[in-house]
Amino acid sequence: MSGMILDELSWRGLIAQSTDLDTLAAEAQRGPMTVYAGFDPTAPSLHAGHLVPLLTLRRFQRAGHRPIVLAGGATGMIGDPRDVGERSLNEADTVAEWTERIRGQLERFVDFDDSPMGAIVENNLEWTGSLSAIEFLRDIGKHFSVNVMLARDTIRRRLAGEGISYTEFSYLLLQANDYVELHRRHGCTLQIGGADQWGNIIAGVRLVRQKLGATVHALTVPLVTAADGTKFGKSTGGGSLWLDPQMTSPYAWYQYFVNTADADVIRYLRWFTFLSADELAELEQATAQRPQQRAAQRRLASELTVLVHGEAATAAVEHASRALFGRGELARLDEATLAAALRETTVAELKPGSPDGIVDLLVASGLSASKGAARRTIHEGGVSVNNIRVDNEEWVPQSSDFLHGRWLVLRRGKRSIAGVERIG
């Protein structure tokens, strides 16, 4: 059964590059493999872009293989070279704190138990932190050709521009050594990562062969992009879509995926969920025949919110999504969920002494361009407050109208939402 994992990855479109697939399939068929993926703590949280390699680890575990999640406590202090510009170096204490936070996130995606498939968490600072400069140059650097390293696309682009520091230039060597250490310690024979990591992973494959005489494998998954070319995983505010609920609320997370374009949603379902081929075919047919129902998008958002934030948070944000658009009770929403939902819209602050009539609130919240436009919308029956229609342009909110004593939900028409927050 364990060898079938490559067939699943293939039909899901999850193989971007690999070492010889026949050899890899034969090893997977012989019995459980140990597989790893690494994640550098360059921020306090992982983000949506990390999900594909993380979930691929989980697929391997479900197929009977043992996953290792590697937190880059050492490599995170350097940073993988980017196409443009040097990374800012973070303080060691900051990286250590982020490493622990990310370690906790990594542990949500694979199962830890005493079985042969029980996951392992490692931190590469354990073996890299004590590595002396002489050991690094003799035992690792000696195996790398500068000519080959200079031929890497990212390095060539950096050298053609502002250049690259020796620190970032050496990142590849440290990541390659991780593969050596994980093979020594755990018999790891497969590293997976994003397609942009191919050069680093292959360097590790070669270093294992040169230092240990062992054959190991590499497999990369596609980088996620939207069909229109926009970058995947950016929230409505332009920042990353973080897994930490304090950095990206469960509501914002859910809304990002429920708004996935029809052109992307089936591909995302293949990559981000464990739905079967038959279930995906049904959702693809529903999208083609009844796109307005957005069944595939709602399933994608639900699956991923449960995965990252749990069932209770998912139920809360699904109710919030319905309630904001008039299909549920706003009063049942807890304040944290309501506030997070409204902050994904425009929120007008209502301070003591500020104009608080409905016309002023519509303009302040951006739902109407002018007072005249606001009055017209009210007379046409297109304005509601807390899901109750307002047809009087002189309407002023009373204290009892504020949800949790603080919030109003304004809606113009069926889809345009804004919030009002009472301050002071």
Curated annotation (Swiss-Prot):
Domain S4 RNA-binding: 356-413
Motif ('HIGH' region): 41-50
Cross-referenced PANTHER family: TYROSINE--TRNA LIGASE, MITOCHONDRIAL, TYROSYL-TRNA SYNTHETASE
Keyword Aminoacyl-tRNA synthetase annotated: yes
Signal peptide (UniProt feature, chain positions): none
EC assignment: 6.1.1.1
Organism: Mycobacterium tuberculosis (strain ATCC 25618 / H37Rv)
CDD domains cross-referenced by the UniProt entry: S4, TyrRS_core
Alphabetical list of HAMAP family matching this protein: Tyr_tRNA_synth_type1 (MF_02006)
A Pfam family per the record: tRNA-synt_1b
SUPFAM superfamilies given in the database record: Alpha-L RNA-binding motif (SSF55174), Nucleotidylyl transferase (SSF52374)
Protein name: Tyrosine--tRNA ligase
Residues involved in L-tyrosine binding: 36, 171, 175
Disulfide partners: none
Top-rank taxon: Bacteria
Family stated for the protein in its record: Belongs to the class-I aminoacyl-tRNA synthetase family. TyrS type 1 subfamily.
The UniProt record lists the keyword Amino-acid biosynthesis: no
Quaternary assembly: Homodimer.
